[in-house]
Amino acid sequence: MAKVVIQECREYELNGLMIKINDGIERLGGWDLFVHPGDKVLLKVNLIGPKSSDSAAVTHSEFVRAVARILKQRGCEVWIGDSSGGAIGGIAPTAKSFRAAGYEKAAMEEGAVIKNFDSEGVIEVSPNSMHEEKMYLAKPIFDADVVINLPKFKTHSSCIYTGAVKNVFGCIPGLRKARYHKMAPNPESFGEILADIHQNAKFKLHIMDGVIAMQGEGPTAGDVYPANKILMSTDPLALDTAALKMLGVEVGEVAILNAAKERKIGESNLEDIIIDGDYKTIPKLDEFKLPKRYKSGKKRNNKVLIKVIDFFKTAPKVNRKKCRNCNVCVESCPMKAIDRDTKQIDYRVCIECMCCHELCMYKAVELKKENFLAGILTGIKLGKYR
């Protein structure tokens, strides 16, 4: 059976974090089961973009520092790595993101090494999905002796939730990520990409920062929520299943996790997941706001019914009053659906991946309710629905 440790932790105080994390790892078998002196240990953080740690958009720098210090005390060489989403002037903003989140400072003070996946080279792997024959993942993932996943507990405007399973998308360096969004335009097919990564990049541990979570329209434009939790497991899907239960969401309602279930990346049956730590049952997060696009599982499996019942849907729209004209949305759109000058979105080619909303650091891309009946009629006219 899979085990998920859930710890109560109310602040990013270093010693308190270390105590809770060490206790959780003991409940999973102890650090000696996972790392040894001299090991090169890569901490795969969530560094979606140049956001501060207090924004709840990235794994908090003090959370990363706590894990790094524990590993350094055990004689490990510690790397901190990721590749941010989006593009500024045709270049992924990862270097800027490491500074904005406070990782550079933490790494320097803890004797850790920053690994910018955009500039460290790639390794070719063979994915199991049918999207393409080859996939290129960041080289440090394979150079490290041990890889530990440090996801952030967040909602996602397109995928409903992002956690341990989805955090691995940052293993794809730089602007290659946009290509995969284009190849896998919906959450279910995107989940195939994530499963491919998990089957090629072997993560030993998953330690989720849920001390301060993000609710609402995550993964960057949502609101902070004091979840006061740290979740730990060797099983990414079991961890996500437990986290979703806290939100009152069934794992089957989050399509990006379907491929992980089908390929047995982990356990998704709550009856086969042991809960340990400060909690012996899964606690509920009260008044936690889910994304506007969230639908109950009763509607989820009937696409025709969704188009009739879900009369209004959310669609991205640029608020020009908030827009800084940085063009991250324009350069990050895999379908090139956003006009550089007017910031108008061509909904005829938009695949609703929400990259524009996800990667705007100024919350200028908003999700608006649209008359979906008009969209259906337009789609029929254009031959989109047959």
What label would you give each PLM region?
Residues 1-326, 330-343, 347, 351, ...:
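N-terminal and secondary-structure boundary signal
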